[in-house]
């Protein structure tokens, strides 16, 4: 019961954002304006705050987690790590993101996974069921696709999902309870 009372103080929701009450949000989370968070999405900030930019789409069963990683012999709690997610990103159904830094205009397709050591720059697409867990920065406009997680570079960044965001902003409140915006 105490954890439920602490959540509103640690959660900041930007103007025009739609965050469904059924979404699980724990820890210090800042959600930018015009972002949509579907029901059953999970945003868990254990190791430090998660800062999510504007115009992001976070679909059902997505897990965005800033996990606390404690070594076996470590008695001192590790330093706080801030997770930054840029603007105009799409997290499709069932994707998992642990990356500490994600740029703008990225797409994590259904059931994709981006690990803790990976940095997504801008305009990247992680294909359905593809996993990227290596310690690297994915170059701009990279597409990772297929069963073997092949890579190629696309000519342009993915188009922002502004029409879909507008539609969901109008429709979701008709069918779900919303968390209140902190800034009006």
Curated annotation (Swiss-Prot):
InterPro entries: DCTN6, Trimer_LpxA-like_sf. The keyword Zinc does not apply. SUPFAM superfamilies: Trimeric LpxA-like enzymes. It is found in: Cytoplasm, Cytoskeleton. Keywords: Cytoplasm, Cytoskeleton. Its main location: cytoplasm. One of its GO terms (molecular function) is dynein complex binding. It comes from the Eukaryota. GO terms for cellular component: cytoplasm; dynactin complex. One of its GO terms (biological process) is mitotic spindle organization. Part of the dynactin complex that activates the molecular motor dynein for ultra-processive transport along microtubules. Belongs to the dynactin subunits 5/6 family. Dynactin subunit 6 subfamily. Subunit of dynactin, a multiprotein complex part of a tripartite complex with dynein and a adapter, such as BICDL1, BICD2 or HOOK3. The dynactin complex is built around ACTR1A/ACTB filament and consists of an actin-related filament composed of a shoulder domain, a pointed end and a barbed end. This is Dynactin subunit 6. It comes from Nematostella vectensis. The lineage of its organism: Eukaryota, Metazoa, Cnidaria, Anthozoa, Hexacorallia.
């Amino acid at each position: 019961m105490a954890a439920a009372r602490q959540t509103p103080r640690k959660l900041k929701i930007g103007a025009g954002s739609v965050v469904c009450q059924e979404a699980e949000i724990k820890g210090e989370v800042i959600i930018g304006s015009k972002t949509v968070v579907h029901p059953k999405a999970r945003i868990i900030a254990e190791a430090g705050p998660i800062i999510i930019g504007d115009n992001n789409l976070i679909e059902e069963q997505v897990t965005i987690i800033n996990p606390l990683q404690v070594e076996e012999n470590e008695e001192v709690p590790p330093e706080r790590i801030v997770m930054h997610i840029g603007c105009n990103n799409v997290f499709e159904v069932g994707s998992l993101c642990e990356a500490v830094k994600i740029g703008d205009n990225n797409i994590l397709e259904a059931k994709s996974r981006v690990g803790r050591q990976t940095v997504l720059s801008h305009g990247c697409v992680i294909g359905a069921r593809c996993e990227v867990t290596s310690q690297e920065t994915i170059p701009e406009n990279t597409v990772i696709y297929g069963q073997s997680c092949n890579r190629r570079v696309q000519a342009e960044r993915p188009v922002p999902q502004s029409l879909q965001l507008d539609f969901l902003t109008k429709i979701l409140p008709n069918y779900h309870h919303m968390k209140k915006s902190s800034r009006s």
